[in-house]
From Swiss-Prot:
CDD domains: 4HBT. Its EC number is 3.1.2.14. Belongs to the acyl-ACP thioesterase family. It comes from Coriandrum sativum (Coriander). GO terms for cellular component: chloroplast. Plays an essential role in chain termination during de novo fatty acid synthesis. High thioesterase activity for oleoyl-ACP versus other acyl-ACPs. The gene is FATA. Keywords: Chloroplast, Fatty acid biosynthesis, Fatty acid metabolism, Hydrolase, Lipid biosynthesis, Lipid metabolism, Plastid, Transit peptide. It catalyses: (9Z)-octadecenoyl-[ACP] + H2O = (9Z)-octadecenoate + holo-[ACP] + H(+). It is found in: Plastid, Chloroplast. This is Oleoyl-acyl carrier protein thioesterase, chloroplastic.
Amino acid sequence: VYPHFKTPIQCRFLTSDSISIRRRTAVSRWRSPTFSANYNGVNAQVLGVLKQEQKEIEEEKRSSSLAEKLRLGSLTEDGLSYKEKFIVRCYEVGINKTATVETIANLLQEVGGNHAQSVGFSTDGFATTPTMRKLHLIWVTARMHIEIYRYPAWSDVVEIETWCQSEGRIGTRRDWIIKDFATDEVIGRATSKWVMMNQDTRRLQKVSDDVRDEYLVFCPKTPRLSFPEENNKSLKKISKLEDPAQHSRLGLSPRRADLDMNQHVNNVAYIGWVLESIPKEVLYTHELETITLDYRRECQHDDVVDSLTSPEVDEDTAVTKIIGTNGHAAAATEARDDSLKFLHFLRVSGQGLEINRGRTEWRKKSEKR
């Protein structure tokens, strides 16, 4: 037993100048500043083995972080989706003491990133695979669709399940089911499409087979959709809003807090900009039920943004009502004439370049509120 280690090690001499070491339990993570000096007479191969073991220990320590131990989430039994529970905090609710749509969108983003970490991806926070990091590739949002059937209130606990799967040859998709953890009621669903961008050139890039092979092993083998209904709202094309818009909010600037780790404006910030041009009287009488956003252009930190909104003329007044709880259930429709629908358009101020187009649907607030 060497006096410099807290646990015993075994040495087996292969030749006069070759030594092999096997650890019985764990080499102490303490490293003496005079480590090399104390072992000047030991074969360099031993030092190499010890350094490699130290490196493996540090990697193991990082992979089993304190955050992962305390996080209320884990992979499902089949390993093909991820569930996590969240408590709605006081700073995440609005005037009605219910979570805002931005809060919901942030939780969706958080659980997606945690899912990637749980399968060994996203060591840099970008939900990227090893090949993507090697080639400086990142995922960016192309489309987001969120439906909220009941907003969770302050101190409620929600459980969000998420999974990803391939979406053609140019992207991937991620879906979510949001439940009230206390009742197991589905209170929201969401789906999104992501495309690959080169972080250096900021140009979109086709998803290679190498990248696809890395993440498909963690995806459902058969398509699983959070919106399995035929002709559901997530599939609806968003018409372009034509000028002049009935409502507008001009001169919006990205804040420093709006920038994410990819050095561009976080996709949740666009939701806030879209809602800036909603008439105030609508906010008093209605609450957001559905939002769909198509991301057309990357917004830079020094861009100035105009938010435009006009009512959507649409003969379809049906609203989806959830019956099941697993994301595969059928949906029923019921006529409703108190809902409001709007088209949205975000552009670079002064240039007219399209950043984002969107569609929202609003339901009448409950009388209880």
